Regions:
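Conserved structural motif at the start of ABC-family nucleotide-binding domains
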Residues: 10-12, 25
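Conserved ABC transporter NBD signature motif
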Residues: 64-73, 83-84
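Conserved catalytic motifs of ABC-family nucleotide-binding domains
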Residues: 175
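Helix-to-loop junction immediately C-terminal to a conserved catalytic motif
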Residues: 56
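Conserved ABC ATPase "signature" region
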Residues: 118-154
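The feature captures the beta-strand-to-loop junction immediately N-terminal to the Walker
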Residues: 41-43
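Catalytic Walker B motif of ABC-type/P-loop ATPase nucleotide-binding domains
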Residues: 179-183
Length: 193
């Protein structure tokens, strides 16, 4: 059952980004409504990843504004943007190669934990129950992405296409309001999105 397209959830207005004398983005505007799918399409070097990096708080544009759910931000870091409900995948993978698929996807749940890091590390008190609930959420994502057979495999041992699915799983684990996908299907022969 498809959901009805809703109100504007992300509004990007007049974004310009320069690196020294090189213009990466010039006066870019668009919006995304709730339950809507949008694509930024262009050749290599057109600035697609730079645009996502501006929305995600990795880059700070010199001009323009980004409004998410009615809150305009210009100088927010990636963590603040994630706390607002924006998640993303990366063109160049940024996974923990020595950690398992399950543990990599669990990192996407980090902001959802209420207990302190110390309580989590000790599995003490409510932290143990909380981790069980977070793992159940991640297990549903692993099932959805059809990567059950690789659950305990270190990510560095997986082919690129499967690593892209793990990256998507980590972003989905954040349970985001907006999901930014940078080259989501690169290296994957099976469509999962």
């Amino acid at each position: 059952m498809s959901k009805k397209i809703g109100d504007v959830i992300l509004d990007v207005q007049n974004i310009s980004l320069r690196f020294g004398g090189v213009k990466a983005l010039s006066d870019i505007s668009f919006n995304v409504r709730e339950h809507e799918v949008r694509a930024i399409i262009g050749p290599n070097g057109a600035g697609k990843s730079s645009m996502l990096n501006c929305i995600n708080g990795v880059y700070q544009p010199q001009e323009g504004s980004i409004t998410f759910r009615g809150q305009t931000f210009k100088h927010m870091n990636s963590r603040q943007v994630a706390e607002m409900g924006v998640a993303r995948t990366f063109q160049n993978l940024a996974l923990f190669k020595g950690m398992s698929v399950l543990d990599n996807i669990m990192t996407g749940r980090n902001l959802k934990f209420k207990s302190s890091i110390l309580m989590q590390a000790l599995h003490w008190g409510p932290a143990a129950k909380e981790e069980i609930a977070q793992r159940e959420f991640v297990e549903r994502i692993i099932d959805f992405l059809e990567i059950q057979a690789y659950r305990k495999t270190p990510v560095g041992q997986l082919p690129y296409g499967l690593q892209k699915r793990v990256d998507l799983g980590r972003a989905l684990a954040m349970d985001p309001k907006v999901l930014l996908l940078d080259e989501p299907m690169a290296g994957d022969r099976k469509s999962v999105v």
